[in-house]
Regions:
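Divalent-metal-activated hydrolytic enzyme cores
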Residues: 1-38, 71-97, 108-212
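Conserved H-X4-D acyltransferase segment
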Residues: 36-53
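Short beta-strand segments
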Residues: 43-45, 67, 100-104, 185-190
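Gly/Ser/Thr-rich loops at beta-strand to alpha-helix junctions
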Residues: 47-49, 104-109
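Catalytic core of membrane glycerolipid acyltransferases/transacylases, capturing the structured
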Residues: 48-69
Length: 212
């Protein structure tokens, strides 16, 4: 399929939305046109296979979504950073009650963090992966002899936990936690099975959200 063909697909999708979906949910969109009141900030990867509303079965207005390669959260600094602005706006202005940091299987950025030489020809990506290097360091410190085949899934989990640590450096998050109005969740979505695993602090590991 060439670029022109896919442009036609996108346009046809808009037409179907306007003719078949929007009319059935007109009242919802009229309400949303006046204001938004999302219940969660969903911070995940920009990967095209990860669709937050599909995974969580949520509708328009329920999730405030921040996406970037590798679902990374830079440590807070006063200089303007897109991720930081999204966090601050969601927590302080919209007063979301939950933040979900959601990694996923087969993540290209996590592969780049694991193998930095693989992204040397992508200088912007290489610089971006630096925000995930503490997770890589933690992986090799805890599992120095881990077989290569097992490194990627564990690093994916370590990265989620590392980004939660970075989240705690943001003043808006600190304030909301102090006020006991915010809960933070760490998830990993497995594309091949549809399973979502959440970090459980009591067990110190990721467990299935479905309870299996």
């Amino acid at each position: 399929m060439n670029e022109t063909d896919f442009s036609d697909v996108l346009k046809a999708g808009v037409t179907r939305f306007q003719q078949h979906i929007f009319p059935k949910r007109r009242l919802l969109f009229e309400k949303l046109a006046k204001a938004q009141k999302p219940e969660a900030l969903f911070l995940t990867c920009a990967d095209s296979r990860v669709i937050p509303s599909l995974i969580t079965h949520t509708g328009p207005g329920q999730l405030f979504v921040e996406r970037n390669p590798g679902n990374l959260v830079p440590i807070y600094r006063k200089e303007a950073v897109g991720v930081s602005a999204s966090i601050e706006y969601a927590v302080t202005a919209l007063r979301v009650e939950h933040i979900v940091i959601c990694g996923h299987s087969d993540c290209g950025v996590i592969k780049g963090i694991l193998h930095p030489d693989s992204v040397t020809k992508l200088p912007a990506v290489a610089r971006w992966t630096e925000f995930g290097m503490p997770a890589r360091d933690a992986l090799f410190a805890e599992y120095p002899h881990l077989p290569e085949a097992e490194q990627l899934p564990i690093l994916t989990e370590f990265n989620v936990l590392n980004q939660i640590d970075n989240l705690y450096t943001h003043p808006s998050v600190q304030q909301a936690l102090q006020e006991e109005r915010l809960t933070i969740h760490g998830w990993v979505y497995h594309i091949e099975s549809g399973e979502v695993r959440e970090y459980n602090a009591d067990f110190n590991r990721f467990v299935s959200l479905s309870g299996d």
